[in-house]
Amino acid sequence: MAKKEVKKIVLAYSGGLDTSIILKWLKNEYGCEVVTFSADLGQGDELEPVREKAFKTGADKVYIDDLREEFVRDFVYPMFRANAIYEGSYLLGTSIARPLIAKRQMEIAKIEGCDAVSHGATGKGNDQVRFELAYYHFNPGITVVAPWREWKLNSRQALINYAKRNDIPIPITKKRPWSSDRNLLHISFEGGILEDTWLEPPENMFVLTKAPEKAPNKPQYIEIEFEKGNAVAVDGVRMSPAELLAHLNTIGGEHGIGRVDLLENRSVGMKSRGVYETPGGTILREAHMAVEQITMDREVMHLRDSLIPRYAEMIYNGYWFSPEREMMQCMIDESQKTVNGVARLKLYKGHCRTVGRKSESDSLFNLDFATFEKDQVYNQADAEGFIKLNSLRLRIRSLMLANKNK
């Protein structure tokens, strides 16, 4: 669709430097109505000035929607039922937020009669893929305006100069030369000084977590209860999904838990450094795996675990709404029907460690069979036949090699 044919755009708007400039640029270049949409996913005070700033920058209408409960209940929790983790470190805090933002953005586009949608993701990053795959899932014919792939503002300084010319406040400063993205699951930091892969992130960058060495000298023990793979209570107090994750963020942050610094492989092919704070998510994943240990069948767990790298890649690469992810989610959720129990964790100076787990209804730990003391139900002599049968292929191969070398 040509620029002159676009009549109304809904922009995913954070109020930061990039989307503020995009809002003004859309008004200047497309000359159309622009509706902004900001999702409250737990950013805190960041959203307070967004409405006023959007109108001042030229928005015709502003949506700010509280999606915190939906975010944790329908996106974070399903992902955590899978124990999803990308490249061994990343708990996918940004990746899992984009499908929900895009979903609501497309709903607003329909309500407002918009013929195009826009986002602030760069042409080098993952988010452009995540947003647009979701857009096309909901409306295969939607027009997507991606300014970073159109304009000539191809450097941070060019953006700043454009902002100054158009009287757009610039939130980035020399004191904090990096960009960040926050929601209830994590805060991510990238760019700026973090592009030096040898440089340790400065302590004043972190928001949610204390430095582990400055965390309390006394460990804290907590208990997290699960029903069908979902956390429902902390220390006996039942909470909604968003409340529970926020509570774990506070506790984990106090003990310096959940800092990650990694070079990840982006979906477009390059490597990029990301620094993350995920205190509540780190605790939640550890607790979930602890309850699974006592309630999940071995073969079910191993089969599920073998698929999780692929599942995590789907989320990272923007395929949340794909049929393969939905199919795999059905399998994962089936495996979680027996994941009912309580995990006991010890939090201390950046570490989160399981120290106990129990399940009144679904425990597969049977002391009569597992004990190292004298037992009446397990005949240890039976192990001989089991071992001989399982070693058969190894013994046959050994005989073959011996004959071959004669």
Curated annotation (Swiss-Prot):
L-citrulline binds at residues 90, 95, 126, 130, 179, 188, 264, 276. It catalyses: L-citrulline + L-aspartate + ATP = 2-(N(omega)-L-arginino)succinate + AMP + diphosphate + H(+). Pfam families: Arginosuc_syn_C, Arginosuc_synth. Pathway: Amino-acid biosynthesis; L-arginine biosynthesis; L-arginine from L-ornithine and carbamoyl phosphate: step 2/3. GO terms for molecular function: argininosuccinate synthase activity; ATP binding. GO terms for cellular component: cytoplasm. The keyword DNA repair does not apply. ATP binds at residues 12-20, 39, 120. It comes from the Bacteria. One of its GO terms (biological process) is argininosuccinate metabolic process. It is found in: Cytoplasm. Its EC number is 6.3.4.5. The keyword Metal-binding does not apply. Keywords: Amino-acid biosynthesis, Arginine biosynthesis, ATP-binding, Cytoplasm, Ligase, Nucleotide-binding. L-aspartate binds at residues 122, 126-127. PANTHER family: ARGININOSUCCINATE SYNTHASE. Homotetramer. NCBIfam families: argG, PRK00509.1. Belongs to the argininosuccinate synthase family. Type 1 subfamily. This is Argininosuccinate synthase. It comes from Citrifermentans bemidjiense (strain ATCC BAA-1014 / DSM 16622 / JCM 12645 / Bem). The lineage of its organism: Bacteria, Pseudomonadati, Thermodesulfobacteriota, Desulfuromonadia, Geobacterales. The gene is argG.
